[in-house]
């Protein structure tokens, strides 16, 4: 067999086992062929398709970055049990996957990357698309994958394939180590012959690890939770990937502890659950943020504690706050200097905590506070969803209309711009897999490709749930090429393009930091009104609806009239009923914002400026920054079974 043939057949025989679930670890390959892989990986895929049809399906992609996004979208829908391989040619084909690799690793989601590499023999150096560095002849562009991958290796000799492939799969299915896994394949080595042991090609099962909490760590966590007066749970993506949403629901119903979710943790509890207060942090709800600010114990479950979750370390203001961090990854479990890490599976740990803790831990006063904050925020969202009758509605109205049109099991997909923040505050999640916002790397262009991957994941599970992609014009222009794949494979998506003629999110941020929305509006060069008046500005004559229609998709354009929201609702109903993909285009007013959730995000403002707007922003920034805390540990003593002590700020 050739090296490529052996690798492809090896991948076809890998299985992930998670309890009663058994599925192919690599159910298919995305690819774009070039001279670096058409005779290697390309030939191997064709040969296996002839010999064993359907065992390793090949899906033609249009952009290499988008291949990885599809893999991540699929992996998220399958709770990290499965992902696709992405095969790219040498040079620019390979480097196009770098952004996707970073996204996968940042999100702790598996993706297998197979970039072609230059000749191992160097017999034809420099080959087409090869980068040369005089100070290191052995360097190739694929070395750029090293800091972006959780595992990287290069098959320099055929005999290396066996150990590399097994180790790659080991990392891919490990919940604590997973991310981008990269195997660089020199184009000459791909086609070399090798004697392959039958054991290498035999079916192999990878049983997902569900590590139990250590007794000592669990006992310390239990003591801290018992002693806490105002505990608060931050539910992260680990709750979803562990399948622990049922255990979380039972735990909070028993104890009364309130929950705020990260972006990845959306779906950990249904929006209308009594203990669920919505998103927490910079884009969170006022309900979650007010309770988080007063919490004396934060129980982080499967969270990375990004700056958006912690409000750039302003969210947790109790002087003696402590953290019980439950995570399969020690790196995340030890964050915020906690002395109470629980390095274990979320589902197993919640089961153990439920068995060790009594019912109804929180006081009546605290429970009433939780209920009151929830009622207030729910009413705020209701108000945000009320149609304004404007020709160009605000984004919150659009979100509310999409929400009303979807079924509970449908999936909303987003990643970048102002939509993630609005969705985190406003979207009412009704299914553990229904909220799919990529906000670890927050990559413009993820939406359509990631949505396609999510839909593949749903179809593979036999689900007919609709996947609704909401995308701004900025992200659409960045990467919409996988619409061709949607059409080619007849996969149904509902795509809502929200056009605000610029980078609305960064425009708002620019105004906040005193940069006056400079460079954030889509206008003809040279006639932007930087004073914000819009006087004399000409919009770019780009017709995104026509562009989408050119792919062969059904397209509905919502005219800017007072009935725009009603028209959007009707278009969504028709799209839901249709078996085909539908793109719905609507214009929005970028200056109509979602309600304030009282979170903060640290974006530094210049200390010196001649612009009055920047000087004002700097004063505001300095005031907000005073709430930041280092969170290095030792703030309280709950873990030892004592009561929170006062912190005089002396550091003693």
Ranges and model annotations:
Residues 122-135, 289, 333-334, 341-343, ...:
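Thiamine diphosphate
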Residues 61, 155, 262, 415, ...:
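Conserved beta-strand termini and adjacent loop/short-helix elements that scaffold enzyme active sites
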Residues 1-361, 401, 405-408, 464, ...:
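N-terminal alpha/beta PP-like core and its mobile active-site loop of ThDP/TPP-dependent enzymes
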Residues 161, 364-379:
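Internal, active-site/partner-interface "lid" segment
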Residues 235-237, 301, 416, 471-474:
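Glycine-rich beta-strand-to-loop/alpha-helix junction loops that act as flexible
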Residues 7, 29-41, 374-461:
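Active-site diphosphate/adenylate-binding microenvironment
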Residues 147-152, 204, 376-389, 529-530:
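Short glycine/proline- and acidic residue-enriched helix-loop micro-motifs
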Residues 182-191, 370-377, 589-592:
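A short, charged, Gly/Pro-tolerant segment at domain boundaries
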């Amino acid at each position: 067999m050739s090296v490529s043939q052996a690798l492809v057949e090896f991948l076809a025989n890998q299985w992930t086992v998670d309890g009663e679930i058994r599925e192919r670890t690599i159910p298919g390959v995305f690819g774009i062929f070039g001279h670096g892989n058409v005779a290697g990986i390309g030939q191997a895929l064709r040969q296996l398709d002839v010999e064993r049809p359907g065992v390793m399906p090949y899906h033609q992609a249009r952009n290499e970055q988008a291949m990885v996004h599809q893999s991540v979208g699929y992996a998220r829908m399958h709770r990290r049990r499965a992902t696709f391989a992405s095969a790219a040619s040498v040079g620019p084909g390979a480097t196009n996957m770098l952004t996707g690799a970073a996204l996968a690793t940042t999100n702790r989601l598996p993706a297998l990357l197979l970039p072609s590499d230059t000749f191992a023999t160097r017999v034809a150096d420099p080959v087409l698309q090869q980068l040369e560095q005089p100070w290191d002849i052995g360097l190739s562009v694929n070395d750029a994958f090293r800091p972006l991958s959780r595992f990287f290796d290069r098959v320099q000799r055929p005999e290396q394939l066996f150990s590399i492939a097994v180790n790659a799969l080991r990392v891919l299915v490990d919940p604590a180590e997973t991310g981008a896994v990269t195997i660089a394949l020199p184009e000459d080595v791909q086609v070399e012959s090798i004697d392959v042991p039958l054991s290498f090609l035999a079916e192999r099962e990878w049983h997902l690890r569900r590590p139990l909490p250590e007794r000592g760590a669990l006992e310390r966590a239990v003591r801290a939770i018992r002693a806490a007066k105002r505990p608060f749970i931050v539910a992260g993506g680990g709750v979803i990937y562990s399948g622990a949403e049922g255990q979380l629901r039972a735990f909070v119903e028993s104890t009364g502890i309130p929950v705020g979710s990260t972006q990845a943790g959306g779906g950990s509890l249904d929006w209308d659950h009594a203990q669920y207060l919505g998103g927490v942090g910079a884009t969170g709800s006022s309900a979650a943020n007010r309770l988080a600010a007063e919490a004396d114990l934060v129980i982080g479950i499967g969270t990375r504690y990004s700056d958006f979750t912690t409000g750039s370390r302003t969210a947790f203001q109790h002087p003696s706050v402590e953290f019980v961090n439950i995570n399969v990854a020690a790196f995340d479990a030890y964050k915020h200097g906690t002395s109470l890490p629980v390095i274990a599976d979320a589902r197993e740990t919640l089961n153990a905590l439920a068995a060790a803790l009594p019912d109804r831990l929180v006081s009546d006063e605290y429970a009433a506070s939780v209920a009151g904050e929830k009622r207030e925020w729910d009413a705020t969202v209701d108000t945000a969803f009320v149609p304004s009758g404007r020709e160009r509605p605000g984004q919150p109205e659009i979100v509310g209309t999409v929400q009303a049109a979807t079924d509970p099991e449908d999936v909303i997909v987003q990643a970048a711009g102002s939509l993630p923040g609005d969705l985190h505050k406003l979207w009412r999640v009704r299914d553990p897999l229904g909220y799919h916002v990529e906000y670890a790397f927050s990559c413009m262009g993820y939406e359509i490709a990631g949505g396609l991957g999510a839909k593949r994941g749903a179809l593979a599970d036999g689900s007919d749930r609709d996947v609704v992609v909401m995308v701004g014009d900025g992200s659409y222009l960045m990467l919409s090429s996988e619409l061709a794949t949607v059409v080619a494979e007849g996969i149904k998506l509902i795509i809502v393009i929200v056009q605000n003629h610029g980078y609305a999110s960064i425009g708002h941020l620019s105004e906040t930091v005193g940069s006056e929305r400079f460079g954030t509006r889509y206008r003809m060069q040279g006639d932007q009104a930087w004073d914000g008046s819009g006087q004399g500005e000409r919009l770019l004559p780009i017709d995104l609806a026509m562009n989408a229609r050119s792919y062969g998709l059904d397209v509905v354009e919502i005219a800017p009239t007072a009935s725009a929201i009603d028209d959007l609702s009707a278009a969504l109903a028709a799209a839901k009923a249709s078996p085909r993909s539908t793109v719905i285009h609507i214009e929005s007013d970028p200056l109509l914002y979602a309600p304030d959730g009282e979170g903060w995000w640290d974006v530094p403002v210049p200390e010196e400026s001649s612009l009055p707007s920047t000087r004002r922003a700097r004063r505001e920034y300095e005031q907000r920054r005073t709430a930041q805390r280092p969170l290095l540990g030792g703030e309280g003593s709950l873990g030892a079974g004592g009561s929170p002590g006062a912190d005089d700020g002396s550091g003693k």
